[in-house]
Amino acid sequence: MAASVFYGRLLAVATLRNHRPRTALGAAAQVLGSSGLFNNHGLQVQQQQQRNLSLHEYMSMELLQEAGVSIPKGCVAKSPDEAYAVAKKLGSKDVVIKAQVLAGGRGKGTFESGLKGGVKIVFSPEEAKAVSSQMIGKKLFTKQTGEKGRICNQVLVCERKYPRREYYFAITMERSFQGPVLIGSSQGGVNIEDVAAETPEAIITEPIDIEEGIKKEQALQLAQKMGFPPNIVESAAENMVKLYSLFLKYDATMIEINPMVEDSDGAVLCMDAKINFDSNSAYRQKKIFDLQDWTQEDERDKDAAQANLNYIGLDGNIGCLVNGAGLAMATMDIIKLHGGTPANFLDVGGGATVHQVTEAFKLITSDKKVLAILVNIFGGIMSCDVIAQGIVTALKDLEIKIPVVVRLQGTRVDDAKALIAGSGLKILACDDLDEAARMVVKLSEIVTLAKQAHVDVKFQLPI
């Protein structure tokens, strides 16, 4: 799925979790990346920092319907009885039941109920009720969810269509074109990553001037190149124009339709929709961001959002608390350079309070894999003494018993050092980032070795 080149630095970090983002943004590197189509224009692919909001399929489909885009008839059901009612109302001889989870690979997933597959075709309202009862309230396990799985709280019940042809269509932002780009392919209904790898020439791109907007001629030209029959090229282009309007209206970073089809009646339909929204637009897209399903997120991500912290949990054992995304990335890099593995990305921003620093420590220490913590602060806008007070408060309140290495530089750093020195806590201070990284890696290794030898080692604070 998906072909947005802008998964950015934060989303690149997310891939370190050993599972891929829900939309296959990794495909972008193949479709639009170093050896992909964009380089045919002599342009260097660049990245921007952003974090995307993903909505459930049924929510995305409702937005499409609102925009006048053609979609199959259907409705969300939050209980087996509702699934029965929707299937009966549709009146089709067969309907499709789709589990609503924010993870890819659902078709090949397995529910904790034992049901195989998150997309099922049923042939009666009674069967719709029976199948949905094995989905709703159950966890679905896919390659992307890992062993934790994702809870399915509702299903999408929709009419079954019999497509003559399937196509792929997407809109994303492409920095090297300085605006949006349409992406199309005659090979829809399959994994776009496979298409990009095996037949990259099957991927067609159409840049859009951000000031002029999409022209009907551009949409018509793309529809023709994608292979839509002449009698429905106009209809396909109309849907593309409506999707582009939706893309702009809601500050989307990606809209992916896979597949867009010509059905047995000759109509153009969008059978599936994945839409990502730029979190930077939350202040003006309240309608969209109120739809976020926190049951699909890590509990720590929810806590981080409530504390206004930028947090992404990873698979390592060294907790990181840093101000600024760039410095956070550099901190993680230098930890890796010295043989360590970061347990998280955590940017407290430039205006963090003592409360936020305490909440940041709560987030870090809620991960039982964390064996040591590195705090790396450069005080520009941020005042180092505020961070220091937060560290002292957190260590006392949370009774943290793992080693904490602190590197502070910048505004009011002397006050911060005095505060830490006078706290009576055993906080390991370093002026040099390289030295701090070496130290925290060594400390994590000591604790790891002790655990492997079944030796109980604790770093008592204070000593």
Swiss-Prot record:
Catalytic activity: succinate + ATP + CoA = succinyl-CoA + ADP + phosphate
Annotated positions binding Mg(2+): 258, 272
Annotated residues for binding of substrate: 323, 380-382
EC number(s) on file: 6.2.1.5
Modified residues annotated as Phosphotyrosine in this record: 84
Listed cofactors: Mg(2+)
One Gene Ontology cellular component annotation held by this UniProt entry: mitochondrion
Pathway where it operates: Carbohydrate metabolism; tricarboxylic acid cycle; succinate from succinyl-CoA (ligase route): step 1/1
Site positions for Important for substrate specificity: 94, 162
Modified residues (Phosphoserine): 279
Chain positions with N6-acetyllysine modification: 78, 88, 129, 139, 143, 216, 368
Gene3D superfamilies from the UniProt entry: ATP-grasp fold, A domain, ATP-grasp fold, B domain, Succinyl-CoA synthetase domains
Modified residue annotations for Phosphothreonine: 341
InterPro entries named in the record: ATP-grasp, ATP-grasp_succ-CoA_synth-type, ATP_grasp_subdomain_1, Succ-CoA_synthase_bsu_CS, SUCC_ACL_C, Succ_CoA_betaA_euk, Succ_CoA_ligase-like_bsu, Succinyl-CoA_synth-like
One Gene Ontology biological process: tricarboxylic acid cycle
Assembly mode: Heterodimer of an alpha and a beta subunit. The beta subunit determines specificity for ATP. Interacts with ALAS2.
Family: Belongs to the succinate/malate CoA ligase beta subunit family. ATP-specific subunit beta subfamily.
Protein name stated in the entry: Succinate--CoA ligase [ADP-forming] subunit beta, mitochondrial
Organism of derivation: Macaca fascicularis (Crab-eating macaque)
Lineage: Eukaryota, Metazoa, Chordata, Craniata, Vertebrata
